[in-house]
A protein has these predicted regions:
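Short, solvent-exposed recognition segments
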Residues: 2-3, 9-13, 138-216
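N-terminal helix-turn-helix
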Residues: 2-96, 102-103, 110, 264, ...
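Short, structured helix-loop boundary elements
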Residues: 23-27, 46, 81, 85, ...
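Amphipathic alpha-helical effector-binding/dimerization core
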Residues: 78-79, 83-180
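Extended hydrophobic
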Residues: 189-263
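A structural signal for short hydrophobic beta-strand segments in well-ordered beta-sheet cores
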Residues: 73-75, 122, 227
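Cysteine/selenocysteine-centered motifs that mediate thiol-based redox chemistry or coordinate metal-sulfur cofactors
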Residues: 173-176, 182, 263-274
């Protein structure tokens, strides 16, 4: 009765250790790929990453796809090169430090707040959860104002920044996203019909800015426009948010022009193209 006990205890570490070793190796390889992409200061081809890692293309692609699903990397351009993803912001600053994005953006946000008199936000796209994440904000001085924490998330279909991102996607991409996420109703004004949402996105593309008309919170309006990188890919958006009593119907176009101008300024300063 005594002999089997040590044998059972001796086998357990071996069973647990083998998978752990493989998992650690995959994690190490994935992190090294992430570092090489960050050091490229732009984007890099799959074959080049595989060569640097000393791995087959298939293994490298599997690791990259896993990180892409979590939003840490993204594919850009017609050649499908790999670049740092926005979700890296959630665990580190690689995405922002690559070109001191916040240092570029914040003065423009402050100028936009002073010009509009309303709270101004900057958001990036979380590709894993398909939500807009606020990474910077300049609040207005009004007692009644929009207030959301840095790191706060907003739904794609019911927010200014989210709809600005959606408007840059193809109809097929939008349809896939809607099937995956659904269209939750936050207020009576939320666009819960795919047809109505797609019509709204068409208007967004035509105007150059999105318009959240009490679709996420009653009494709150928001207008947003995208910022583009050097691959003409949208990766962030600037928005103006305020109560319907100040963002009135007759001023919507005026605020829209302001946010378009600010987004273009950031795109240019960042070295992006539209």
């Amino acid at each position: 009765m005594v002999a089997p006990i040590p044998a059972k205890r001796g086998r357990k570490p071996a069973v647990a250790t083998a998978p752990a070793t493989g998992q650690v190796q995959s994690l190490t390889r994935g992190l090294k790929l992430l570092e090489w992409i960050a050091e490229s200061n732009g984007s890099v081809a799959l074959t080049e990453l595989a060569q640097q890692a000393g791995l087959p293309n298939s293994t490298t692609h599997r690791l990259l796809t896993t990180m892409q699903q979590q939003g840490f990397v993204r594919q850009v351009g017609e050649l499908g090169h790999w670049a740092i993803g926005a979700h890296a912001f959630m665990v580190g600053s690689s995405f922002l430090q690559s070109r001191n994005l916040l240092a570029i953006v914040h003065p423009i946000l402050r100028n936009l707040m002073e010009e509009s008199g309303e709270t101004v936000n900057m958001a990036v796209l979380d590709q894993s959860d398909h939500e807009a994440i606020i990474i910077d904000q300049v609040q207005c001085t009004h007692l009644m104002r929009m207030s959301a924490p840095i790191g706060g998330k907003f739904p794609m279909h019911a927010s200014g920044a989210g709809k600005a991102f959606l408007a840059q996607l193809s109809e097929e991409q939008v349809t896939k996203l809607l099937h995956r996420k659904g269209l939750h109703a936050y207020t009576h004004a939320t666009l819960v019909s795919p047809v109505h949402l797609k019509e709204d996105l068409a208007q967004t593309r035509k105007r150059g800015y999105s318009f959240d008309d009490e679709e996420h919170a009653l009494g709150l309006r928001c207008l947003a426009a995208c910022i583009f990188d050097e691959h003409r890919e949208p990766f962030a958006a600037i928005s103006i948010s305020g109560p319907i009593s100040r963002i009135t119907d007759d001023r919507v176009t005026e605020f829209g022009a302001m946010v378009i101008k600010a987004a273009k300024e950031v795109t240019l300063a960042y070295g992006g193209m539209r």
